[in-house]
Amino acid sequence: MRRSRGFRSKTRHKLQKVKRPGRSNPITRKIQSFNEGDLVHIIIDPSIHRGQPHPRFHGKTGRVVGMMGKSYVVALKDGNKDKQLVVRPEHLQMQE
């Protein structure tokens, strides 16, 4: 039987959550808001599957260009190509 090549394949360490006391999923990550033009880091929270971008974009930085429902549309470059991702706010962090 062929091996599965699912959405989360080869992410054993990339999507691993660091165990620290008192570090569950805070509600503030879910209700944070961004404005158009803000620079954000894509940091995937592996315990929340909804609105998760592909793991190849984990750690990348992009610019918020709009909203789509509760999610944000983030524009970034993947090599030479411009791409737009639809990502929920749990997987985004504001660049400082």
UniProtKB/Swiss-Prot annotation:
Protein name per Swiss-Prot or TrEMBL: Large ribosomal subunit protein eL21
Region (Disordered): 1-29
Origin organism lineage: Archaea, Methanobacteriati, Methanobacteriota, Methanomada group, Methanobacteria
SUPFAM superfamilies recorded: Translation proteins SH3-like domain
Biased composition (Basic residues): 1-22
One GO CC term, this protein: ribonucleoprotein complex
GO biological process: translation
Listed NCBIfam families: PRK04306.1 (NF003303)
Top-level taxon of origin: Archaea
Similarity comment text for this entry: Belongs to the eukaryotic ribosomal protein eL21 family.
GO molecular function: structural constituent of ribosome
Organism (species): Methanothermobacter thermautotrophicus (strain ATCC 29096 / DSM 1053 / JCM 10044 / NBRC 100330 / Delta H) (Methanobacterium thermoautotrophicum)
Keywords: Ribonucleoprotein, Ribosomal protein
PANTHER family linked to this entry: 60S RIBOSOMAL PROTEIN L21
